Amino acid sequence: MKKIIYQQDEKDCGVACIAMILKHYGTEITIQRLRELSGTDLDGTSAFGIKKTFEKLGFDAPAFKAGDETWQEKDIPLPLIAHIISEQKYQHYVVVYKVKGDEIWIADPAKGKIRKTISEFSKEWTGVLLFPKPKAEYKPSIERVDSLSTFFPILIKQKSLFITIFGIISSYYFQGLLDNIIPNQARSTLNILSIGLIFVYLFRVLFEYSRSYLLLLIGQRMSMSIMLGYFKHVLSLPLSFFATRKSGEIISRFLDANKIIDALASATLSLILDIGMVILVGTTLAIQSTQLFLLTLAFLPFYILVVYVFIRSYDKANTEEMSAGAEVNSSIIESLKGIETIKSYNGENHVYDRVDSEFVTLMKKSFKSVTLDNVQQSLKMVIELISSVLILWLGSSYVIDGKISLGQLITYNALLVFFTEPLQNIINLQVKMQKARVANKRLNEIMSISPEQRNTNINISKNIFNKDIKLDKVSFSYNMKLPVLRDVSLEIYSKSKVALVGVSGSGKSTLAKLLVKFYDPSEGNITYGDINCQDIENHKLRNHVTYVPQESFFFNGTIIDNLTFGLSHQPEFEKIFRACKAACLVDFINQQPLRFDSVLEEGGNNLSGGQKQRLAIARAILNDSEIIIFDEATSGLDTLLEKEILEYLIKLQDKTIIFIAHHLSIAKACDEIIVLDQGILVGRGTHEELSEKEGVYRRLLNA
């Protein structure tokens, strides 16, 4: 196992192991692509998901439950993947790439390469092994998207900055004149030398100021391109992405972008200013004294060696630090979202202890990273100080021997700072570039995910949403788990009012989310009229099909802003008022100090559950879609309010409305009831028809 691939997040150990095995056989695929193939979610990757991924990529991957005697076999196929229980009692995967005697060599995506005895390994090993081997028709392939070069087009946009930079460089021509004049005049006049040195130091201040200013300017321009580009891409991703990622993981990558911006901005200046200064001043130094300049260059290999030695350590430390930071972010965000539950169960200490433990881990990883940086900087300083002493030592000897003048030595040392500082800037890019490389891998995990379908070549008429909806043998499962829907075939008639009923977990909400294309069916087809929903771009479909969840989200803004959210233009006030009246909201709004201009808190925290649901219903009515899906959207209402709102919705003759409800009073009012049980369609008909038959609906009715 030549190179280990570290997991970017705690749930990525399985896909990191897959990536290592693939790389061993010449294939490189992004971690995010492997997450999609293996069905990795918030619970991690299953052994079944790993096996199926290898099979999709041209491998056989038999899985076995084995014992310690396996490690004594001479022909055990390596590398293989082993399932273990980590020290933190988490399920974990590692790659075993070498077995010799009573020792096992492991590539752990969380820790790196480790060597253990068989007895030590057996204490954590569950006995599960996967043996991936390429089939005869297997062909290696390489899919790379994590190069920093993907951001270079952003730099090209900064043409005005480059012109400014070249203008600054050209204005430094005066320094070149001084560098040439001083050596010729130093012997004859101390005054000229002193004045020249003052100009040199003034130029040094100007150079540093210009460098810092340009760094800030380029950084801000790039921040807008990279960070806003990332956020825009995240918004375009399918709902399935958010179901398999913690909020902290997504946000931490947004913050990681700063490392990329810092590195690229610094690299831009180094390529233009620092390298230019090194060449310009280096030429001047060589003219001053070839021997001293050669001595200066002799220390470059030592700098390069120090940089090279720390490359792998920096990669590991940065990956661990960023991953630990994502865990802390996730826990804090999760805790703030669930503060009511935490308070209800006196769980403050439990939550604090968990965050405290994760934060201590982050501090340890951060300390390790900073310590590496300190050690490297100390080594660089040793080289710099020794080189300075040797240059003065040798230079003074040359002055004594009459090979150079004292003025030449003073001038050389005065100019040397303009050679060493830009050189240090270039060398110090290593730390920033390595952090950026790790951050870029994490960022590109998200950027490489395909956004939701936007454009299709099929011209879609809005009239198709006034036609029947058909499901033909539709099945669906989340991330290679047990099917939630199984072979469902049904027809929902245009402008009908339909209720989906069944016990919890029967697949009602999942079916609704398929209709609005939050997810795609694993098998089968859904059609609106005669058009397959896969041929309808998501944005257009959701203009005509509105989904109202049980817990709708409200933004920090006025009531009217939240009611009209997502609309291309604000409707007339009369239309807004009618929608609020239909949702029984008028009295509530009249009680607010600024009525429609009253401000809602983030998440609607100053509203009750019932008030939120009525606002969500009013928003759906105002959206005026041909099809509306209410997913338990009246569960927080009292019986009288629910009845009044339901009567209005049932009377909407021009709309197809689908209700998902546990309250059978809603089902009774509908034209048709569809009954699901464990993902299977087990009945359909009116309330009267189903209540007379023995089955799930009758059991729900009698419960």
Curated annotation (Swiss-Prot):
Chief subcellular location: membrane
Gene that encodes it: lagD
Membrane spanning residue stretches: 162-182, 189-209, 224-244, 267-287, 291-311, 381-401, 409-429
Membrane topology label: Multi-pass membrane protein
UniProt family annotation: Belongs to the ABC transporter superfamily. LagD family.
EC number(s) from the headed UniProt entry: 3.4.22.-, 7.-.-.-
Effect of C13A: Complete loss of precursor processing
Residues binding ATP, per UniProt: G502, V503, S504, G505, S506, G507, K508, S509
Function recorded in the entry: LagD (TC 3.A.1) is involved in processing the signal peptide and probably also in export of the bacteriocin lactococcin G.
Domain ABC transmembrane type-1: residue ranges: 153-435
Domain Peptidase C39 positions: 7-132
Residues annotated as the enzyme's active site: C13
Cell location: Cell membrane
Comment on protein domains: The first 150 amino acids are capable of cleaving the signal sequence of LagA, the lactococcin G alpha precursor.
Keyword Glycoprotein among UniProt keywords: no
Alphabetical keyword list: Antibiotic biosynthesis, ATP-binding, Bacteriocin transport, Cell membrane, Hydrolase, Membrane, Nucleotide-binding, Protease, Protein transport, Thiol protease, Translocase, Transmembrane, Transmembrane helix, Transport
Protein name: Lactococcin-G-processing and transport ATP-binding protein LagD
